[in-house]
A protein has these predicted regions:
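Conserved ABC ATPase "signature" region
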Residues: 116-133, 242-243
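ABC ATPase "signature
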Residues: 223-224
Length: 253
């Protein structure tokens, strides 16, 4: 499969700490990849670099072979139209003084996407399981799970090819978490959207992703299809992560 989003040899240091050390990742159209690892292994650093929100000390991130560097809104517009993100905390990701419809339409205006923005917002609200008239309401009128649906609608507004999300469901309770994971899976399948998801919840990974990449101390120590890696972990870190989730079967069943 040819790569849509491809990172090659990413290294990121913070002072004497090497957060990421020569990491390469590729994501094909429609593919769903998880990044897992213990706390401090470099997952969020990798997500930020893949979103061109941070500059690597070495390595490149490219979309369809075109390299991207963090920079002005104008210089990265082409990239942001196609690579979007969903925030970790839906509670904080909306301006309380902006109606939901305007918030969902915000990327369309910022990224100068042409067309009828109100119609697109109504379509998106329905796609994420909300009523079209939600557009007139305020963020505080929605539950955490509904706000995460709104955040997904906002991310999908410019019709991206890739969603990179760092712990997109960790702020939600278990039942709502599974509903939002289901929504992401369904949208990814329907729109051919590629997903790269950082998650400490291996149940979420198993439910949502095709392939998993295990990070340890900034390096990829294991990767492969989720079933194979979780079924027969080859690296002690993977085994430790799995051991820490005794209720995995219960979470995903
Ligand atoms: N802005 C920063 N300044 C200094 N050190 C940082 C910074 N961001 C990350 N680090 C360090 O880089 C390493 C990787 O951090 P990162 O947040 O990517 O890990 P993570 O796997 O996402 O962790 P967690 O699961 O706890 O969120 C850690 O040692 C962290 O302390």
């Amino acid at each position: 499969m040819s790569a849509l989003l491809e990172a090659t040899g990413l290294t990121r240091r913070y002072g004497h700490v090497t957060a990421l050390d020569d990491v390469s990742v590729h994501l094909a159209a429609g593919e769903r990849v998880a990044v897992v690892g213990e706390s401090g292994s470099g997952k969020s650093t990798l997500a930020r670099l893949l979103l061109a929100l941070d500059t690597p000390d070495a390595g490149t991130v490219a979309l369809d072979g075109r390299p991207v560097r963090p920079g002005s809104a104008r210089s990265t517009r082409w990239f942001r139209r196609r690579v979007q993100t969903v925030p970790q905390d839906p509670g904080r990701s909306f301006n309380p003084r902006m109606r939901v419809g305007d918030a969902v339409a915000e990327p369309l205006a910022c990224l100068r996407v042409h067309g009828d923005h109100s119609a697109r917002v109504a379509e998106l609200l329905v796609a994420v399981g909300l009523e079209p008239d939600a557009a007139r309401r305020w963020p505080h009128e929605f539950s955490g799970g509904q706000r995460q649906r709104l955040a997904i609608a906002r991310a999908l507004a410019p019709r991206p090819d890739v969603l990179v999300a760092d712990e997109p469901v960790s702020a939600l309770d278990v039942v709502v978490r599974l509903q939002v994971v289901e929504l992401l899976a369904q949208l990814s399948a329907a729109e051919g959207l590629a997903l790269l998801v950082v998650s400490h919840d291996l149940g979420v990974v198993q439910h949502l992703c095709d392939r998993v990449l295990v990070l340890d101390a900034g390096r990829v120590v294991e990767q492969g299809p989720v079933g194979e890696v979780f079924g027969a972990p080859a690296h002690p870190v993977t085994a430790r992560l799995l051991d820490a989730v005794p209720t995995l079967a219960a979470v995903v069943s």
